[in-house]
Amino acid sequence: MMRAMWEALAALAAVSCLVGAVRGGPGLSMFAGQAAQPDPCSDENGHPRRCIPDFVNAAFGKDVRVSSTCGRPPARYCVVSERGEERLRSCHLCNASDPKKAHPPAFLTDLNNPHNLTCWQSENYLQFPHNVTLTLSLGKKFEVTYVSLQFCSPRPESMAIYKSMDYGRTWVPFQFYSTQCRKMYNRPHRAPITKQNEQEAVCTDSHTDMRPLSGGLIAFSTLDGRPSAHDFDNSPVLQDWVTATDIRVAFSRLHTFGDENEDDSELARDSYFYAVSDLQVGGRCKCNGHAARCVRDRDDSLVCDCRHNTAGPECDRCKPFHYDRPWQRATAREANECVACNCNLHARRCRFNMELYKLSGRKSGGVCLNCRHNTAGRHCHYCKEGYFRDLGKPITHRKACKACDCHPVGAAGKTCNQTTGQCPCKDGVTGVTCNRCAKGYQQSRSPIAPCIKIPVAPPTTAASSVEEPEDCDSYCKASKGKLKINMKKYCKKDYAVQIHILKADKAGDWWKFTVNIISVYKQGASRIRRGDQNLWIRSRDIACKCPKIKPLKKYLLLGNAEDSPDQSGIVADKSSLVIQWRDTWARRLRKFQQREKKEL
């Protein structure tokens, strides 16, 4: 009965392999006109769902590396059969050079025909401690369901199955078979499997009987008896346990009748060898639920045909720009597809941030990198400094952000309101870009205060508010007519400045004029600077028109350094020279300034 079941399994696996080999090839062109098959990775509504590659015999047609094969040189071997209690031997020649008498490793993974068995065979009597190994490379990671071997010889007394997850660099045990588990593999016999050790190999004496002498089967199920097998989707331990890139079978001890040391021991020893008609590794290409098939890439390597925005040989990572949530294996309940970062079409790269993902309630963790089109932010969702949103365009538009264009002098900074585009204006400046003076202000030459208040002229001049003393003629001599500026006058004074009278206020015995110093042609120890300052003149000097000053006018002021009443500003008196400004004087005063520097 077991033999019949095995034959059915082998035939099914062979047919599956043949179908898989021709899938997608020219042989299907005759069906091109038929309706397209439903997408296994999406449901009827187009939503992602788990998909897995077909179950196959991953060993079919693949090369197997063996440590021993008979026939080099040609050698005799004898097949033992039993008739009642009588033991018969039929001897033959194994010759690797003769295809009809050869038993190469290719027979392990060819199409298994029960009516025409082909068997790989080892050299005779390679007994413990000498091993015979079969090593099969699957070409990529597979999730292995079973490993089976059908024998042409008696089954081994002891053998082990190993797996590699790193293409043969390291090996871990998968299963041990022996009648002497402790002696051969230092393992307990049929140790119980619990959740704590379900990822470990066990040793059993099942399938180790010598009989049948031919046609015996050893089949190892990777999940049989493992406690978490019923919840495989949620068991990373078992998912790792069934994963393999390579399978190795190590035959450790031959079964014998105990006659190998008798008189005709040579004949007996020629009867003991390992011979296998079929090696199968049943499983699926490992794609973590994100692919329905495996294909050959440009390098002829077997890789998953990844879906759900995943990438990698096993669809084990998210493809670029799909990092809004962490990669996860698909399950029967959730496809766990990778999600694109939300960058509003302004970025081509992003990264995943676990902290942000947790803060969002495990919904979004993508952070956009190198936002373009003058955008900024985690999602490129606002305009960078110096730009504001054009509400007439969607945020995904290439020109969703407009330049603020804040005036370099009138604005207090380059950043404008993200919604209105209003720049931060300095005092007295207005306009969206701060490009003009507000009402009641006039432009100045100061980059610090480009707009100043327009002073309200008093009903009378400063001089008319003070009664002129009777002795003005003896006190000072008011200037009359036009005055000339020469180098002598320039040199006699401590400072020479161009001023603009803004307003005048009475302060006890003084008049305080708010002036804007437009240009400085000479300065003393007080280090006069351009901009708004106070000009102090005694009331008696103003009353005698020494000097004569009117608000809102521009003057050339040459005077001597004196202490002002409030220790700020400059002082003018009857000896100061105050002349209404002429633009032609600027060049002459610069010459005076240069000549004075040369003479120093």
UniProtKB/Swiss-Prot annotation:
Residues 285-340, 341-403, 404-453 form the Laminin EGF-like domain. It comes from the Eukaryota. PROSITE patterns: EGF_1 (PS00022), EGF_LAM_1 (PS01248), EGF_LAM_2 (PS50027), LAMININ_NTER (PS51117), NTR (PS50189). SMART domains: C345C (SM00643), EGF_Lam (SM00180), LamNT (SM00136). It is found in: Secreted; Cytoplasm. GO terms for cellular component: basement membrane; cytoplasm; extracellular region. The keyword Metal-binding does not apply. Its main location: secreted. The keyword Glycoprotein applies. A motif (Cell attachment site) lies at residues 530-532. Netrins control guidance of CNS commissural axons and peripheral motor axons. Its association with either DCC or some UNC5 receptors will lead to axon attraction or repulsion, respectively. Binding to UNC5C might cause dissociation of UNC5C from polymerized TUBB3 in microtubules and thereby lead to increased microtubule dynamics and axon repulsion. Involved in dorsal root ganglion axon projection towards the spinal cord. It also serves as a survival factor via its association with its receptors which prevent the initiation of apoptosis. This is Netrin-1.
